[in-house]
């Protein structure tokens, strides 16, 4: 390409037009490199368009004559006069009035001193001058005042165990509680989708407690620790008192009754507190049988702990403390009236036999102590847990009816009166079984003579009918329940074996926790971050303790062929178990930069881990 040097000197270099500079300016470029601005050429220069400024703009940007800012305690209206010299139009700026706020008469009427001018059609040069107005009054947003809620509307009763219940509509600071996430790992698939493993293969579900059992236990813990505001802070020796059942007026006792749970200050355990409202006791006579009830031990009876009177609820009340069984429901809620958020469990003859056997066992234990179950033999006073029923209101009738009991004892004598009460217990058991049979088959209609038309076996019908006529529970058990007791014992032993097998899976979990704790105690300690200290302690790449860092990466920081993190729980458990056993299996450790490869055994890593941990614990 031939270039005329004379004409090229007057032609602007295209590199200047395109890039803003020419790197061949001082290296033989024949074109002109003169620009209309004073921007320096070179690799760090910016395009001419972006750096081009006018003398006026530079003067406005840095003005040495601008007065220094000094805070003033004068009112805001005086600031307009103070800074009037900076902008000649500061007094002409219109006052900002927020939309939706009605203008007051003082704002709508122009004043003589500072008359508000209509906003002219502005240009771009006028925008910076009207951006800030020191005389603008403070902005007060207009918000409608919410109307107070009507006083005559009553709020519906709140269930303390209903999760995700909405809070008050006007309360924006209290959020509804979310349910706990019980599936800490993926639940086991249904049997039809389960993958068949060989005899030597295991998965994560076989290494932990059963998912359903774990979820049940976690729900019980959640119910035990759940609190609810509004109750009294302290009731006798119990704190964190939370209502769990509001019964209103009891159909059995004819008094107002409710159930709470509270934590004892004595032993820290949680107990169920049954409260009877407006019940006054002037002496210790009603509590004379409490010690005998407290010493009663039975698998089918809720143990009574204490009984006392209190005014912590606002009125004189009787409180009886029992053992607490979280998430337990009554027979009435389990089979008759559906509980909120629950479902009814269908009754079968096997379940009826199970209930009959356990009821007879509970009543037999009570009668051996020269006591009577009385009002606790009711569908609403018997709680149900897994394959277990328990009498949950023992001793209440002895306290509530103490005056009538004393009068009857004085009339017929204590032995005769107690014998009559025990006979009534046996009749109540038979009546309760008839009620459950009616739930199963409404044809019975709560009539013991219609049991034969219920479709149940003749053995069960005969057992219930004889129960209403017997006077001796011992002979009744030998005649009707001896064979059924073997079925109950077999079921309980199977349940015990299942729980022991689940417990055995969690028995040695502490070993792996100890290993991970030791590794985290040792690796990446801050006092070994210094190179000199790390070299002296043996943590450099050539040191013996460097193997622990590589092993930590080998266990927890594995990646696949695509570079994604590997989160295989089974692999971590297998590796830590091998480390705990200290087997001689060899494996390869690779550094993060893949420049160091070491073949070691689990035994060597375990010995090194124990040695370093002993060094740390000794303070060396």
Swiss-Prot record:
Keywords: ATP-binding, Coiled coil, Cytoplasm, Metal-binding, mRNA processing, Nucleotide-binding, Zinc, Zinc-finger. Residues 39-73, 95-168 are annotated as: Disordered. Disulfide bonds: none annotated. A zinc finger (C3H1-type) spans 7-36. Residues 522-620 are annotated as: Knob domain. It is found in: Cytoplasm. Residues 63-73, 101-126 have a biased composition (Polar residues). GO terms for molecular function: ATP binding; poly(A) binding; protein kinase activity; zinc ion binding. ATP binds at residues 274, 323-330, 380-381. Residues 226-482 are annotated as: Pseudokinase domain. SUPFAM superfamilies: Protein kinase-like (PK-like). The keyword Nucleotide-binding applies. One of its GO terms (biological process) is nuclear-transcribed mRNA poly(A) tail shortening. HAMAP family: PAN3 (MF_03181). The N-terminal zinc finger binds to poly(A) RNA. Homodimer. Forms a heterotrimer with a catalytic subunit PAN2 to form the poly(A)-nuclease (PAN) deadenylation complex. Interacts (via PAM-2 motif) with poly(A)-binding protein PAB1 (via PABC domain), conferring substrate specificity of the enzyme complex. This is PAN2-PAN3 deadenylation complex subunit PAN3. The lineage of its organism: Eukaryota, Fungi, Dikarya, Ascomycota, Saccharomycotina. The gene is PAN3.
């Amino acid at each position: 390409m031939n270039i005329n040097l004379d004409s090229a000197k007057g032609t602007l270099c295209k590199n200047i037009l395109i890039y803003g500079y020419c790197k061949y300016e001082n290296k033989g470029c024949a074109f002109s490199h003169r620009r209309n601005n004073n921007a320096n050429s070179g690799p760090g220069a910016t395009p001419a368009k972006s750096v081009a400024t006018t003398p006026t703009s530079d003067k406005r940007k840095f003005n040495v004559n601008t007065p220094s800012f000094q805070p003033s305690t004068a009112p805001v209206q005086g600031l307009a006069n103070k800074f009037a010299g900076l902008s000649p139009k500061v007094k002409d700026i219109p006052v900002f009035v927020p939309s939706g706020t009605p203008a007051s008469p003082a704002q709508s009427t122009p004043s003589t001193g500072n008359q508000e001018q209509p906003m002219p059609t502005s240009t771009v040069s006028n925008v910076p001058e009207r951006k800030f107005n020191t005389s603008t009054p403070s902005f007060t947003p207009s918000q409608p005042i919410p109307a107070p809620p009507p006083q005559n509307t009553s709020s519906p009763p709140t269930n303390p165990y209903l999760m995700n219940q909405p809070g008050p509509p006007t309360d924006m600071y209290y959020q509804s509680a979310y349910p706990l996430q019980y599936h800490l790992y993926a639940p086991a698939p249904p049997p039809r989708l389960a993958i068949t493993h060989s005899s030597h293969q295991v998965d994560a579900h076989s290494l932990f407690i059963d998912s359903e059992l774990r979820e049940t236990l976690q729900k019980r813990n959640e119910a035990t620790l759940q609190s609810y505001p509004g109750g009294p802070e302290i009731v006798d020796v119990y704190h964190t008192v939370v209502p769990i059942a509001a019964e209103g007026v009891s159909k059995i006792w004819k008094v107002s009754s409710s159930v709470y749970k509270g934590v004892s200050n004595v032993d820290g355990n949680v107990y169920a507190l049954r409260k009877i409202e407006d019940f006054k006791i002037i002496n210790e006579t009603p509590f004379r049988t409490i010690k005998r009830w407290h010493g009663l031990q039975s698998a089918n009876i809720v143990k009574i702990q204490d009984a006392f009177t209190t005014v912590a609820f606002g009125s004189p009340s009787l409180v009886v403390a029992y053992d607490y069984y979280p998430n337990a429901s009554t027979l009435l809620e389990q089979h008759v009236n559906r509980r909120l958020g629950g479902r009814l469990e269908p009754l079968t003859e096997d379940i009826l036999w199970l209930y009959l056997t356990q009821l007879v066992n509970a009543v037999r234990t009570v009668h051996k102590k020269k006591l009577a179950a009385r009002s606790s033999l009711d569908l609403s006073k018997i709680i149900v847990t897994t394959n277990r029923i328990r009498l949950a209101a023992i001793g209440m009738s002895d306290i509530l009816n103490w005056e009538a009991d004393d009068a009857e004892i004085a009339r017929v004598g204590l032995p005769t009166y107690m014998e009559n009460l025990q006979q009534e217990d046996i009749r109540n058991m038979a009546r309760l079984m008839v009620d459950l049979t009616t739930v199963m088959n409404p044809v019975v209609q709560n009539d013991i003579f219609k049991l034969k038309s219920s479709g149940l076996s003749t053995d069960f019908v005969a057992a219930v009918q004889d129960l209403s006529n017997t006077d001796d529970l011992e002979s009744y058990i030998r005649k009707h329940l001896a064979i059924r007791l073997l079925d109950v014992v077999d079921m309980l032993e199977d349940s015990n074996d299942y729980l022991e097998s689940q417990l055995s899976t969690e028995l040695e979990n502490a070993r792996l926790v100890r290993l991970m704790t030791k590794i985290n105690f040792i690796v990446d300690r801050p006092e070994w971050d210094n190179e000199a200290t790390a070299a002296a302690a043996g943590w450099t790449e050539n040191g013996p303790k460097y193997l622990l860092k590589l092993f930590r990466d080998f266990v927890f920081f594995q990646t696949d062929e695509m570079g994604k993190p590997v989160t295989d729980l089974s692999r971590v458990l297998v590796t830590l178990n091998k480390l705990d056993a200290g087997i001689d299996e060899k494996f390869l450790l690779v550094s993060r930069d893949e420049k160091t490869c070491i073949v070691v055994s689990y035994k060597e890593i375990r010995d090194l881990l124990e040695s370093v941990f002993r060094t740390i614990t000794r303070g060396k």
